[in-house]
Amino acid sequence: MNLTELKQKPIAELLEMSDAMGLENMARSRKQDIIFALLKKHAKSGEEISGDGVLEILQDGFGFLRSADSSYLAGPDDIYVSPSQIRRFNLRTGDTIIGKIRPPKEGERYFALLKVDSINFDRPENAKNKILFENLTPLFPNERMKMEAGNGSTEDLTGRVIDLCAPIGKGQRGLIVAPPKAGKTIMLQNIASNITRNNPECHLIVLLIDERPEEVTEMQRTVRGEVVASTFDEPPTRHVQVAEMVIEKAKRLVEHKKDVVILLDSITRLARAYNTVIPSSGKVLTGGVDAHALEKPKRFFGAARNIEEGGSLTILATALVETGSKMDEVIYEEFKGTGNMELPLDRKIAEKRVFPAININRSGTRREELLTSEDELQRMWILRKILHPMDEISAIEFLIDKLKQTKTNDEFFDSMKRK
């Protein structure tokens, strides 16, 4: 019996299973309580149960395996991990653990971890001699992540425009600057599907902070990756806890030389949550931002890096502008210089219903010569020289019009050469 498989089943199927096993009055229970009751029943019959989750170590020294399906929220189906196991395997918050579990004994409330089978998708003995994330050497991104699918569809236009004006590499720290209703959510969906298609070796996590519940559902259905969310009706402490769990998980995977991509929507809302949660220092910046409030969101964003020893952590975060809030402007200004790739979306272009609404002249990647070939770089510069005299709207319209006539960017460059 596997705990994760049960969590992925719809509630109707779980109720049928509980009826078949003779469990009564389950119809009005929460999903986690139904799973808890089912596993307890299975364990009584002597079956082996396996479970997995991401470790969160509490101040008392013990920890719990939280589930990504419930966005790392504490629940009755969490798995208890004892302090002795944490010391023995040198575990830290964010480690992904798979192992055998046992049902709670008399007076216990949680399932407990019996045996560790794997840590961060690797053998437990390999986890002991890994280097800490803080001690790894950061580099500029030097391995390209292509965004174009090459099928010539209209959905592929976003990826192709990004490839032309702001190429993304493994370990990029990118900021998507977006006014309201400029199509940032659709753009993130496109980027997510292109990453899973072109770079299946990357572990993708989409982190939605303070978003609408219907957008979370849509993202879960369109993205073939892990979607972790804290909707706008949750308290700010919850936003902060979710973000910390995600970044810790990503760091632990990078320590095992994995490539991780986090798409964050949005860093502005995360900074607002931290501003509410941290104790007041008495120093307040314009717009009501506490002087120390942005330290942790900066630490989150600054974790993105390409690692010399192997592995990388890429973070693409959206920053909200033109919302009419002074606080949002201050937060954006603080993050403006920290990224090494910027992709501004333009409200005027979006109002004309031209998508993707990217402002090409202002977008770009630092040290893009490390990601592109000499020949491609020259072509991209020539394209910028052609588009620069135009205003934002006519530049993107001209580019989209020309891109629609070809299937791939290479074909587009060849047609440019002929002209």
UniProtKB/Swiss-Prot annotation:
GO process terms (BP): DNA-templated transcription termination
UniProt xrefs under SMART domains: AAA (SM00382), CSP (SM00357), Rho_N (SM00959)
GO annotation, cellular component aspect: cytosol
GO terms for MF: ATP binding; ATP hydrolysis activity; ATP-dependent activity, acting on RNA; helicase activity; RNA binding
EC number: 3.6.4.-
Residue span of region RNA-binding 1: 61-66, 78-80, 108-110
The protein's name in its UniProt record: Transcription termination factor Rho
Domain of life (superkingdom): Bacteria
Pfam families on file: ATP-synt_ab, Rho_N, Rho_RNA_bind
Region (RNA-binding 2): 284-288
Site note RNA-binding 2, residues: K326
UniProt domain Rho RNA-BD: residue ranges: 48-123
Family of this protein: Belongs to the Rho family.
Organism: Pseudomonas aeruginosa (strain ATCC 15692 / DSM 22644 / CIP 104116 / JCM 14847 / LMG 12228 / 1C / PRS 101 / PAO1)
